[in-house]
Curated annotation (Swiss-Prot):
It is a peripheral membrane protein. This is Fructose import ATP-binding protein FruK. It comes from the Bacteria. The complex is composed of an ATP-binding protein (FruK), two transmembrane proteins (FruF and FruG) and a solute-binding protein (FruE). Residues 8-244, 262-505 form the ABC transporter domain. Belongs to the ABC transporter superfamily. PROSITE patterns: ABC_TRANSPORTER_1, ABC_TRANSPORTER_2. It is found in: Cell membrane. ATP binds at G40, E41, N42, G43, A44, G45, K46, S47.
């Protein structure tokens, strides 16, 4: 493959923001007919590198060559004119237009009286057919097809401009296995036509299935370029995060189960807590310094129980005892006042506030508990923000950067920092490691253990059973909106234990099915 002339050569790319060097002398070379993965943990510089190649960011140093010609992109149009097309995780198409109109947008066929829509849709059909998408009618409204199909339409649109380079940024994050298979079939067609594909994904299985070559970044620096087939997974992980896979596997490995002393009272003790149509009545107790895992399949009631504990949803049954006193946690404000915090599973829509800075996102919940007419003094605010950015290793270390410009893992850290700033006694974390890379995931798992060791009660909700088992002292197992078991975690408990419990328990009787 290396006997081909490269389509793109990026050398010594450096991009600086105020007080932060996002990229520091990074190289990237893309070859025709290859799928090339850009690898690195969240915050490594992958998105910044893509934005340099697509003209979103101007580079401070370095050079970009496309087809042997030096390029200086002053915007995305310059990059498109050079043959670089991008399909983002959130497809940037016009849902009010048809499939064909989206494919040909900006390249419509014209006649003597303006756009010839018949010829435009015929041309769109041709481009769709070239990619094996003959089944899609170009007249179909884009809004009526799935996200997966919309991504394929976006790729067809890239082919209209005769793209030399196709950038796919996390295209599989919302796809099921069949949709991923269809996407990969299209990617292979595009690759075999001579296009260079730059692929970004945090799914290692997919990386090893579809890519030919890897470039690894870490902390904004170039680490290495390797061939995928020659690179063991543990070696790749080590290059991405600066730690070996063996080191990561030790997180939680020596964790002793938190033993409850006789007469000790829980932080939270709920009896028969439920909400009709949401989750059946549940008993749960959570002690100081204890990690309680909520495990179950999608729709089991994990999130619903977490929301009831926080007051995000109002229960219609049960009692709630907090530090030995009966309370009514009926809304999030009351929960915060009682030192209960909840980090949502949907961090983008319900968690972070993208247009606000890192500083503002960390401070907003604490300010809410004090009231808007009692602003946090600047010296105190600076100390709080600095403390949690350092403790959680938020990168880039720029508190005045809009949080939407951070990677997913760093956004999650900011969200956790927001709740830690309120000094909770109970922290409910719903899917805190979803959609982030292995390095950030390991950091957040370690944070959970550290918080528990400091005496905080933690509810850990995750669809990844392995991390529930690794981190939890007790595991509440849910199925079909019922609590079906409580497992005291020890060396005999594994993912298989939970799976067997779910598979073999009748939700109505609580006994083996």
């Amino acid at each position: 493959m290396t006997d081909k002339n490269p389509i793109v050569v990026m050398k010594g790319i450096t991009i600086e923001f105020p007080g932060v060097k996002a990229l520091d002398g990074v190289d990237l070379t893309l070859y025709p007919g290859e799928v090339h993965a850009l690898m690195g943990e969240n915050g490594a510089g992958k998105s910044t590198m893509i934005k340099a190649l697509t003209g979103v960011y101007k580079i401070n140093a370095g050079s970009i060559m496309v087809d042997g010609k030096p390029q200086q992109f002053n915007g995305t149009l310059d990059a498109q004119n050079a043959g670089i097309a991008t399909v983002y995780q959130e497809v940037n198409l016009c849902t009010n237009l048809s499939v064909g109109e989206n494919v040909m947008l900006g390249h419509e066929k014209r006649g003597p009286f303006g756009i010839d829509w018949k010829k435009t849709h015929e041309a769109a059909k041709k481009y769709l057919a070239q990619m094996g998408l003959e089944s899609i009618d170009p007249h179909t409204p884009l809004s009526s097809i799935s996200i997966a199909m919309q991504q394929l339409v976006a790729i067809a649109r890239a082919m209209v401009i005769n793209a030399k380079v196709l950038i796919l940024d996390e295209p599989t994050s919302s796809l099921d296995a069949n949709e991923v298979r269809d996407l990969f079939a299209i990617m292979r067609k595009v690759r075999d036509s001579g296009v260079a594909i730059l692929f970004v994904s945090h799914f290692l299985d997919q990386i090893y299935e579809i890519t030919d070559r890897l470039t690894i970044l870490r902390n904004g620096q170039f680490i290495k370029e390797v061939m995928t087939k020659d690179t063991p997974r543990d070696e790749l992980i080590g290059m991405m995060i600066g730690k070996s896979a063996a080191e990561l596997s030790q997180i939680g490995a020596k964790k002793a189960r938190r033993e409850i002393t006789p007469g000790e009272k829980p932080i939270v003790d709920v009896k028969g807590l439920g909400k009709k149509g949401t989750i059946n009545p549940v008993d749960v107790d959570i002690y100081k310094g204890e990690v309680v895992g909520f495990a179950g399949l999608l729709g089991s009631g994990r999130t619903e129980l977490g929301r009831l504990l926080y007051g995000a949803d109002k229960p219609d049954s049960g009692t709630y005892t907090l530090n030995g006193k009966k309370v009514n946690i009926s809304d999030p404000y009351t929960a915060l006042k009682n030192k209960i915090a909840y980090s949502t599973e949907n961090r983008r829509d319900e968690g972070i506030i993208g247009d606000l800075t890192v500083r503002q996102n960390i401070l907003i919940a604490l300010q809410a508990t004090r009231g808007m007419f009692k602003p946090i003094p600047k010296k105190e605010a600076d100390a709080i923000v600095d403390k949690y950015m350092k403790e959680l290793n938020v990168r880039p270390a720029d508190p005045d950067r809009p949080v939407k410009n951070l990677s997913g893992g760093n956004q999650q850290k900011v969200l956790i920092g927001r709740w830690l700033a309120t000094h909770p006694e109970l922290l409910i974390l719903d899917e805190p490691t979803r959609g982030i890379d292995i390095g950030a995931k390991a950091e957040i798992q370690q944070v959970v253990l550290d918080l528990a060791s400091q005496g905080m009660g933690v509810v850990f909700i995750s669809s990844e059973l392995e991390e529930v088992v690794r981190l939890s002292d007790d595991i509440e197992v849910l199925k079909d909106r019922h609590k079906i078991a409580e497992i005291e975690n020890d060396d005999t408990v594994s993912q298989a234990t939970i799976v067997e419990t779910i598979a073999n328990t009748n939700v109505n009787t609580g006994k083996e099915a």
